[in-house]
């Protein structure tokens, strides 16, 4: 009560808070888009970008490295050209260096399976390979990619994390 009655008593004190609230808000609204808004926007973008770099590696390995890495690898690499399997293996080797040995071995083990499963289930190869096997084991086709996807996720995620951290460290 004392502070409340004392604040309005002073001419400068009640003058300052309204100024802060009204003037501050007004200034933010007016200058927001041009000067003041650009900085927080930049910061937010930066935060989101860094979070986007961080999250996929840790929280959604299937989402980011699955769709981006494996999608490119499978769709562009193994399906279109048969040389696809050595090409993606070369890439991690170049990026990783010493850590590639077990990763590439795992990739070699799972890549042929996955490329086979993908070619069988892909629409382009469906008329050739998929039609005869579709009527037989549809579950087998569904299981194979699932298995190899899981294995590839496990192999790729350390890769993604390592390459990401490497890229972050370089920058």
Swiss-Prot record:
The lineage of its organism: Eukaryota, Metazoa, Chordata, Craniata, Vertebrata. Pfam families: DUF4644. This is Uncharacterized protein C16orf90 homolog. It comes from the Eukaryota. Residues 1-41, 114-147 are annotated as: Disordered. InterPro entries: DUF4644. Residues 116-125 have a biased composition (Polar residues). Residues 27-38 have a biased composition (Low complexity). Signal peptide: none annotated.
């Amino acid at each position: 009560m004392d502070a409340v009655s004392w604040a309005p008593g002073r001419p400068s004190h009640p003058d300052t808070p309204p100024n802060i609230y009204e003037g501050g808000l007004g200034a933010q609204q007016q200058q927001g888009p041009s000067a003041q808004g650009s900085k927080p926007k930049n910061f937010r973008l930066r935060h989101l970008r860094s979070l986007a770099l961080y999250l996929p590696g840790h929280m959604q390995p299937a989402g980011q490295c699955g769709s981006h890495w494996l999608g490119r690898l499978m769709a562009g690499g193994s399906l279109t050209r048969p040389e696809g399997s050595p090409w993606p293996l070369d890439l991690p080797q170049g990026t990783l260096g010493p850590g590639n040995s077990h990763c590439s071995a795992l990739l070699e083990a799972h890549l042929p399976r996955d490329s086979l499963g993908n070619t069988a289930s892909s629409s382009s190869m469906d008329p050739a390979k998929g039609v005869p096997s579709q009527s037989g084991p549809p579950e087998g086709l569904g299981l194979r990619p699932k298995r190899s996807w899981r294995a590839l996720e496990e192999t790729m995620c350390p890769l993604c994390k390592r390459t990401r951290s490497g890229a972050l460290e370089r920058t």
